[in-house]
């Protein structure tokens, strides 16, 4: 199981993601972002690519898709907050976008 990061670690390690449109929940339990695509097909194709990454690293997002918009949030439930797994996953998501 991954260790929950401290607020200081979260601020340092996730800083670059904030400039890319990610935001924290008020309690810093999860990080979230909304992605908007050209159409549903592009949104769903992107979700499929992300699903393969999730399976590869065995870490799965909470997400919702409405037409061309995908809302994604990341948290490590077993740890009760953000961990290195969430940081790595968010970085991989950014590479696919």
Describe each region flagged by the PLM.
Residues 1-97:
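Charge-rich alpha-helical segments
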